[in-house]
């Protein structure tokens, strides 16, 4: 499985990590810089905390941050 780690940057996931994710949230600079974004591989879909959005998927490079487009 390959997942995006950032804009147009994809990497093969380590063994046992079969889920891609995109985690977004706002911090103090959200109004000027936009959402904070973490992308990557995981063994299971991370648990979202209040104010954090997480999207998970399980096909190659499926963890697209929609505001960037496909990244391809």
From Swiss-Prot:
In-chain residues carrying the UniProt-annotated modification Arginine amide: 72
Keywords per UniProt: Acetylcholine receptor inhibiting toxin, Amidation, Disulfide bond, Ion channel impairing toxin, Neurotoxin, Postsynaptic neurotoxin, Secreted, Toxin
GO cellular component, one term: extracellular region
Tissue expression summary: Expressed by the venom gland.
Highest taxon of source: Eukaryota
Cell location: Secreted
Cysteines joined through disulfide linkages: 3-20, 13-41, 26-30, 45-56, 57-62
Main localization of the protein described in the UniProt heading: secreted
PROSITE patterns: SNAKE_TOXIN
Disulfide bond as UniProt keyword: yes
The keyword Secreted belongs to this UniProt entry's keyword annotation: yes
CDD domains: TFP_snake_toxin (cd00206)
GO molecular function: acetylcholine receptor inhibitor activity; ion channel regulator activity; toxin activity
Pfam families: Toxin_cobra-type
InterPro entries referenced in this protein's UniProt entry, alphabetically: Snake_3FTx (IPR003571), Snake_toxin-like_sf (IPR045860), Snake_toxin_con_site (IPR018354), Toxin_cobra-type (IPR054131)
Gene3D superfamilies in the cross-refs: CD59
Record-stated family: Belongs to the three-finger toxin family. Long-chain subfamily. Type II alpha-neurotoxin sub-subfamily.
Function: Binds with high affinity to muscular (alpha-1/CHRNA1) and neuronal (alpha-7/CHRNA7) nicotinic acetylcholine receptor (nAChR) and inhibits acetylcholine from binding to the receptor, thereby impairing neuromuscular and neuronal transmission.
Protein name according to UniProt: Alpha-elapitoxin-Ast2b
